Amino acid sequence: MALRATYREAAGVTVVDIGGRITLGEGSALLRKTIRELLEDQRTLILLNLADVDYIDSSGIGELVSAYTGVKNRGGSLKLLHLTRKVHDLLQLTKLFTVFEVYSDETTALRSFQ
């Protein structure tokens, strides 16, 4: 399934709803493009909703780290929401839970930006 990404505003935070596979090629490129567009629009508080991401490879993990770094370098914050079991396990295996703030509830995640 191809990656799809849409975004919406909630409580001053840009919530990016992502679905599909974040993999080498189109998937990681779309994520990179979406984050770049948000940063160009001065949107630096970003919550990535990964509830519908069914697969992520090492390239996808690299894009998440790159997105995090890019947002942080702009003085912003990027957090993760609704990890699937596969994505959760991969972040745990790669020890990226020490980098990302991860939430299972959108309301709590949005409050964390304040």
Language-model segments: which ranges?
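STAS-typified acidic loop motif
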Residues: 4-33
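Amphipathic alpha-helical interaction surfaces in cytosolic regulatory modules
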Residues: 22-100
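Acidic phosphotransfer microenvironment of two-component signaling modules
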Residues: 85, 107-108
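Short acidic-hydrophobic, aromatic-tinged amphipathic segments that line or gate anion-handling sites
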Residues: 101-105
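Short, charged, intrinsically disordered terminal tails
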Residues: 109-114
